[in-house]
């Protein structure tokens, strides 16, 4: 009987391992990402084990089947911060990271801030990793993920990253890339984040696809003091190429996205709902092709006062795209001022194989994020 039970247990583990893997294939600029490939799946059980698997030099398929709570793993830090947006209960405060309060908000009242130290810096993710969640069970709480300094070939799918010092700007980012290549982030939910849900830093992030994710900006704390998160998607790279597709951006108030500094963004078939401020902020060096997107109850789709980049976008289907990318571009819905006719954007993307956009819809609201593979 014991022998039979052991065989049954082994068979169950083998079946579980065989069933685990990346679902679907990446689209867009990171279409050739393979992550950990066919490596035998590993199932971390502690935060230390998860950090070790993500940061080592082995090709790995890492499966999350529980919540990994980093909130108290490094204790708390108490220091002097500032209150740039006031001290009302719904307003975020700011940590004085790198003298940010001192240099950029010198007139803001100072205040004492106490935050969870672990959240400040994300977990290092090394090359050739697939990080996959089981069902809706795979959650990283209190700390984000960080892909930097030349890492490549990473897939993150079907997990949630939540609760990173949401009271405090500079409390931590959910997903950080800086000098990373071939990164596919798919069906990830991010919620209650102190700073950016996604940030691509000033070094080149060559081929990145951010698809079918749920950026949940609903929070008790906000820089706009209204329960809508301001810091959402910041693309600040050098020679970056980013595909942003099928994502659901809910209750945001700014930087959704902010694009600048030689970043090429193909942003299509996303859904914005209940944005109390602006969605797009396009600075110098931001090149954006926006098509097939749907906007519902968005106060300002494009921040026109600070616009310095290049945009191709239209509220009606455009055949101008034909001669550059081999097909017509697809109209946005309720795009407001998100109109641009820069053929520089199209010309610079003409050598790339761009996925086709579908007609704009609200489907990401039910299809994006963890648990919706």
Curated annotation (Swiss-Prot):
Pfam families: Pectate_lyase_4 (PF00544). Residues 354-366 have a biased composition (Low complexity). Residues 354-373 are annotated as: Disordered. Glycans are attached at residues 128, 274, 348. The keyword Lipid biosynthesis does not apply. Its main location: secreted. It comes from the Eukaryota. One of its GO terms (biological process) is cell wall organization. It catalyses: Eliminative cleavage of (1->4)-alpha-D-galacturonan methyl ester to give oligosaccharides with 4-deoxy-6-O-methyl-alpha-D-galact-4-enuronosyl groups at their non-reducing ends. Its EC number is 4.2.2.10. GO terms for cellular component: extracellular region. GO terms for molecular function: pectate lyase activity; pectin lyase activity. Residues 1-24 form the signal peptide. Keywords: Carbohydrate metabolism, Cell wall biogenesis/degradation, Disulfide bond, Glycoprotein, Lyase, Polysaccharide degradation, Secreted, Signal. It is an enzyme of class 4 (lyase). The keyword Lyase applies. InterPro entries: Pec_lyase, Pectin_lyas_fold, Pectin_lyase_fold/virulence, PEL. Belongs to the polysaccharide lyase 1 family. This is Probable pectin lyase D. The lineage of its organism: Eukaryota, Fungi, Dikarya, Ascomycota, Pezizomycotina. The gene is pelD.
